């Protein structure tokens, strides 16, 4: 095509307001150019950041992302999403599976590319991309002990404390993180005091962290370190401790998980375990695209270590 002809075509396109029909173009290529990211909700900061990082990682590979939630409003859950996946609008799914979803191995035996992210097991049926929560929690506990804490409280348990069951846990953020704390304490010849475990059920919000920490304070059982199982809980714990007159970190150290955006900007900047979303999102995208193009055929578990992001809530 000559430059003159190209200029004429571009003028006509502009005058007519023509836009490329991406869906139609991709049908001709035997793929849609889209992947689906399914999360329980976009309210938790961790999941919102997962979505943003997944979109960016996909964009770098010339893919777009449909983001959908399956645990809000009239949504019917992850199982329904898996059952009714539409391959004409998306080439595959990255699924962040909630701890409360009733999912079986059979549910994950699907006929489209699927990658699971997060702390739920896939029973070896599907690709699984997740940081090592057990190792991260052990690191967090060790970090507090090495800086002078001797009695640790944990904020964010889901169920009644059962050390034997927790040591066998293979899924669930709360269970795996508690397992890591217990393992690290036992390596040091210590036991976690059941009276210092704050149960928040499924509520991992700032308010829950504050309420449960206040209950621990009111119990009168002494503690000088708090492991909050996410940063929202940790922010609540910091609020309760300061309201009760405790000096952080001089009297009580606090560490969270996920390195949320607000963590560095609190009145007492929060020490936290890195969420490793910088690794999780691009790894999941690379994995799903490998499934789509056929270069990856066997399910794998892909994990990585987390590091302490040290700030003023610890010594």
Identify the residue ranges that each predicted region occupies.
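Generic beta-sheet signal
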Residues: 96, 117-119, 131, 155, ...
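Glycine-rich phosphate-binding loop signature in dinucleotide/nucleotide-binding domains
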Residues: 16, 87-89, 147-148, 216-222
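Alpha-helical recognition/docking segments in bacterial nutrient-uptake
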Residues: 22, 30-142, 146
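Flexible loop/turn connectors
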Residues: 66, 214-315
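Periplasmic-binding protein-like
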Residues: 37, 87-96, 153-156, 220-230, ...
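N-terminal helix-turn-helix DNA-binding module of bacterial transcription factors
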Residues: 1-31, 315
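Hinge/beta->alpha junction and helix N-cap segments in small-molecule ligand-binding domains
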Residues: 22, 40-49, 68-76, 129-139, ...
């Amino acid at each position: 095509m000559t430059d003159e002809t190209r200029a004429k075509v571009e003028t006509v396109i502009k005058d007519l307001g023509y836009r490329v029909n991406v869906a139609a173009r991709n049908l001709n290529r035997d793929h849609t150019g889209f992947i689906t990211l399914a999360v329980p909700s976009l309210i938790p900061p961790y999941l919102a950041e997962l979505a943003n990082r997944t979109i960016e990682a996909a964009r770098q590979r010339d893919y777009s992302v449909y983001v959908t939630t399956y645990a809000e409003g009239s949504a019917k859950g992850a199982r329904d999403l898996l059952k009714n996946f539409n391959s004409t609008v998306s080439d595959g799914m990255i699924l962040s599976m909630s701890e409360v979803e009733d999912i079986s191995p059979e549910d994950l035996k699907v006929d489209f590319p699927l990658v699971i992210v997060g702390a739920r097991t896939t029973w070896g049926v599907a690709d699984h991309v997740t940081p090592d929560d057990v190792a991260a929690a052990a690191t967090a506990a060790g970090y507090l002990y090495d800086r002078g804490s001797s009695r640790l409280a944990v904020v964010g348990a889901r169920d009644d404390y059962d050390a034997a069951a927790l040591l066998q846990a293979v899924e669930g953020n709360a269970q795996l993180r508690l397992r890591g704390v217990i393992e690290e304490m036992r390596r040091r010849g210590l036991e976690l005091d059941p009276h210092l475990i704050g149960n928040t059920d499924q509520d991992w919000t700032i308010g829950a962290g504050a309420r449960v920490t206040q209950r621990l304070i009111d119990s009168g059982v002494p503690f000088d370190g708090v492991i909050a199982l996410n940063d929202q809980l940790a922010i609540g714990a910091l609020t309760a401790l300061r309201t009760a007159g405790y000096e952080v970190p001089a009297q009580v150290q606090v560490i969270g998980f996920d390195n949320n955006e607000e963590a560095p900007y609190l009145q007492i900047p929060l020490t936290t375990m890195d969420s490793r979303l910088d690794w999780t999102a691009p790894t999941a995208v690379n994995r799903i695209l490998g499934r789509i193009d056929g270069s990856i055929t066997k399910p794998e578990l892909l994990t990585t270590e987390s590091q302490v992001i040290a700030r003023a809530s610890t010594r």
